[in-house]
Amino acid sequence: MPNRQAASAPVLARGQGVVYRELPCRSLLNRSTSRRMPFTWTINPYRGCEFGCRYCYARYTHEFMGLEDPHLFETEIFAKTNASDALARDLARLKDPGSGIAMGTATDPYQPAERKALVTRGILELLARSEDARGIRFSITTKSDLVTRDLDVLREIGHRMRLSVNITITTLNRRLSRILEPRAPRPGRRLLAVKALAEAGIRTGVFIMPVLPGITDRPASLEAIASAASRAGASTIAHQVLFLMSSAKRSFYPFLSERFPRLLAGYRRTYALSAYNTAAYRKRIDLLMESLRKRYDLDGRSDPDRAPGRRPDLQMSLAFRE
């Protein structure tokens, strides 16, 4: 959708500095571009995300619509209002589900728009009744406790599909969370969502993604998340060190300059030639997280459908143009 069409898309509602628009889609399933991913297909009910996470890697997806300013990713939200119909068509002709479907890879399916738009709810209701979806692995990733609104339909899906729900928690520090993820629910509310999902019998994991060097990577901080996740009933934790593409630097570096100026030079050096942190740093975090998984029984050994640990190149699966 070029810029002119994006600007003329029907307005569904307006919020404080946010415009919600309608975006019909011909297809909802998008094939992952990376063979290393633990899923083959992705679903993103929205384009853009109001949570405004400072490290967000998906801002570049608005560029496909001619919206070049990274800030527009959190202020121009497009709802795929015919998503369930599009998904029904996709599933009917899906010959190979591969390693399954992941929802929420380039937007949060439970961002504020979902309270009224109900796009995610419609998708879940379709999956709960679709014979074409039976037996497929399906995962949801979110930072929002709004997911508990849909416990009824998630239970139904759990009887038909291999369902897991992952709650992303990057820090338990409320103040730091407000700085990094200004409009996302606080960490305590996310932990309550983990507890509610687990008590409902839904396989539930916690994603520590991304681990931010010098900001959220203290061993005590990571252990606090692991301990809290275990107490809440999570079966796994997974992590990923910040993967910083050039497009994300446009908004992330100014943020660092304002809030963490002493770290900016180090980030520039580390990510100058690659979107990855150094192998030595990633190995150190991997070893720490592996020890925490064992210590808090979060390795998913009793759950064959889960793949705990480091999630390789998650951001690389996000190229989509539907």
Explain the meaning of each model-derived region.
Residues D108-Y110, V211-G214, A275-Y276:
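Short histidine/acidic/glycine/proline-rich micro-motifs that form metal-
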Residues M1-P24, L28-R31, D217-E322:
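Auxiliary Fe-S-binding modules of radical SAM enzymes
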Residues I140, L172-L176, E181-R183, A196-R218, ...:
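Conserved strand-turn element in the central/C-terminal portion of the radical SAM core barrel
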Residues D145-T148, L212-E223:
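Active-site glycine- and acidic-residue-rich loops that bind
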Residues N3, A7, V11-Y46, F51-N166, ...:
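Conserved Radical SAM active-site core
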Residues A117, R121, A184-L191, P219, ...:
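Non-membrane alpha-helical structural segments and their capping/turn regions in soluble enzymes
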